[in-house]
Amino acid sequence: MTRPVIALLLVLAIACSASANLDGCLVMMTSPTEVLPGGTYTFSFWVQNESQDGEGIATIQISFPDGYTIFEGTMACDEIVVGRPSFDMYIPPIDHTAIWEDNNGGTGEILPTEGTTVYIDATVADVSYGTPIFWCVQGDGAGDEVHEVCGCIQVAINPVEDLSWTAIKALYR
């Protein structure tokens, strides 16, 4: 019997120029490392601000593929210092996007050289193989353009047969 296993490949796409405010900022999925269709998992993403001119990250968006179910009540983030980051966390209606948004209107919540982890639970779609999870971070508007950096994390399928030599050999291909 073949059981599909989705391997989450951490493909980092950083789309910013050398002089951009958010140059070097990134989002990386740290868990889970693999999932099964129909399973519910806590997805965690490391968000790092490497702005070269002082811009803070004010908004983080993680967009899951169609068919995923995300659970707003499970959204969380790690504090960098007590009371910060202080994000409003929500999921817009009719969307598969989780948003962590600065709620005090000041400088961004993740300052240059800082990073934090954001979390959300999601049920994996049965038919989303090869569809990426997209991410965007928006800055607080300080300094020069570019105030947004986006990328994706590729989701791929790796079908293997349970309890067989084929399954074991597939790990080494």
Regions found by a protein language model. Give the residues of each.
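Low-complexity, intrinsically disordered segments enriched in Ser/Thr together with acidic residues
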Residues: 99-131
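Serine/threonine-enriched low-complexity regions used as flexible
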Residues: 122-153
